[in-house]
């Protein structure tokens, strides 16, 4: 079964919509390089679209009615948006669920040290990375520092044109004979992914003068002392903006497209759909790259607790009503898929691979060898989605992650399926997934948004 290239179907009006969506997407990537920044930007866009913090309804004990738009935030790192439908919540919701964390380097709690005239920040990598990809790149620092007095300082260094950037150094080729004999996963050791941040000594300082200069600069700009690193969350990410890629500008090159490409298109679809019959939900969560753990990951009770609040405000606040709502819901686990790469064709089985420019991808299952750890969607649900996408003239394709036993991966789908709801993975194909700079097709971004709109309206 061959899938058509979406580009060949676009008229001038389609191209205008496509370019507008992708311009907004690039801006979202630039403004959201961490999960906190993504939540902040999502709240801004939601409030502009008329969404109100659910806490306001709870404090005022205000009843929810069809058409109401609310959002809930969990610890500034996860967000759930809802538009109340005309049908009872116990009949289920239509959920788009993506994650907004991405692989990166995290600064350790006691990170700052000086070594032979250089100052470094010690890091611990987050998520699945090829460690050697992170050396000799311009890097930026994003995050927050929480002081003992309760003040929380936002930190972004390396994005403004006048900012310095940072990097992890590498061994010169002339002395790399031994290094290059090592397996790829040990060519650069995790403990060597330390960020070079300074080399100038502070005048009239005898001991650790370079470190002293770094601390002075941090204190001058942010009021940060060395002990404040103990209560900081600082993330090291590639510096620079999302860019159009290719002579034809048909692709996007950017950091964090896994999974912010699906997060953004889910958010846009959520804000676009009006007056749904079934309640709509857009769920953007944290910690997927390390197992969806913690209070802001999908395994927490944030979503379930928020649904309980909605039901209570809608006059259906019983445990049984919550269970019925969850079990009757349908979900697209909006997560990316591996795009077929001709340079690494041996890793893919072409009949069941995702291709650039052919639309959103449906992954009936993910997992590893033998489908281990997978959510395997039901055939009936796949059939229903086929009808929804075809009726909405969405370009879509099906795929597995790669050849059997070559590798594997997982998403939040299996977690949500524990409620008994129908769940399937559905997202955008990505080249160079988990690299510092990933690639997507503008056409697939556009088709994903179309698919998510169709799902919210008709699932």
Report each predicted region and the residues it spans:
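N-terminal hydrophobic/helix-forming segments and targeting peptides
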Residues: 1-459
């Amino acid at each position: 079964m061959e899938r058509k290239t979406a580009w060949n179907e676009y008229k001038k009006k389609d191209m205008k919509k496509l370019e507008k969506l992708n311009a907004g997407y690039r801006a979202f990537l630039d403004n959201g390089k961490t999960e906190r920044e993504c939540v902040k930007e999502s709240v801004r866009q939601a409030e502009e679209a008329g969404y109100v913090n659910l806490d306001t309804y709870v404090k005022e004990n205000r009843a929810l009615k069809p058409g109401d738009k609310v959002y809930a935030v969990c610890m500034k790192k996860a967000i759930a948006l809802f538009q109340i439908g005309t049908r009872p919540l116990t009949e289920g919701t239509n959920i788009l669920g993506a994650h907004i964390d991405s692989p990166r380097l995290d600064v350790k709690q006691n990170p700052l040290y000086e070594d032979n005239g250089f100052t470094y920040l010690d890091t611990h990598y987050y998520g699945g990375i090829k460690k050697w990809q992170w050396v000799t790149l311009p890097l930026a620092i994003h995050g927050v520092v929480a002081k003992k007095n309760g003040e929380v300082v936002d930190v972004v260094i390396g994005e403004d044109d006048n900012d310095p950037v940072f990097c992890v150094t590498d061994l010169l080729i002339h002395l790399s004979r031994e290094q290059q004999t090592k397996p790829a996963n040990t060519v650069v050791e995790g403990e060597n992914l330390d960020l070079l941040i300074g080399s100038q000594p502070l005048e009239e300082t005898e001991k650790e003068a370079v470190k002293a200069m770094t601390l002075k600069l941090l204190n001058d700009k942010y009021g940060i002392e060395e002990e404040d690193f103990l209560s900081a969350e600082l993330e090291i990410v590639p510096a620079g903006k999302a860019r159009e890629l290719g002579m034809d500008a048909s692709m996007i090159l950017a950091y964090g497209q896994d999974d912010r490409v699906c997060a953004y298109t889910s958010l846009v679809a959520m804000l676009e759909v009006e007056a749904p019959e079934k309640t709509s939900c857009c769920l953007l969560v944290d910690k997927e790259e390390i197992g969806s753990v913690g209070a802001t990951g999908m395994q927490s009770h944030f979503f379930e607790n928020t649904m309980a609040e909605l039901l209570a405000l809608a006059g259906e606040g019983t445990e049984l009503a919550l269970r019925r709502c969850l079990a009757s819901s349908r979900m697209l686990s909006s997560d990316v898929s591996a795009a077929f790469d001709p340079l690494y064709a041996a890793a893919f089985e072409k009949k069941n691979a995702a291709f650039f420019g052919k639309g959103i991808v449906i992954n009936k299952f993910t997992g590893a060898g033998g489908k281990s750890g997978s959510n395997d969607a039901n055939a009936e649900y796949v059939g229903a989605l086929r009808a929804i996408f075809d009726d909405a003239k969405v370009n879509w394709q099906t795929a597995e992650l790669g050849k059997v036993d070559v590798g594997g991966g997982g998403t939040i789908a299996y977690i949500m399926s524990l409620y008994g709801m129908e769940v399937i993975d559905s997202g955008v194909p990505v080249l160079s997934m988990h690299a510092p700079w990933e690639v997507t097709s503008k056409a697939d971004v556009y088709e994903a948004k179309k698919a998510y709109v169709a799902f919210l309206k008709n699932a």
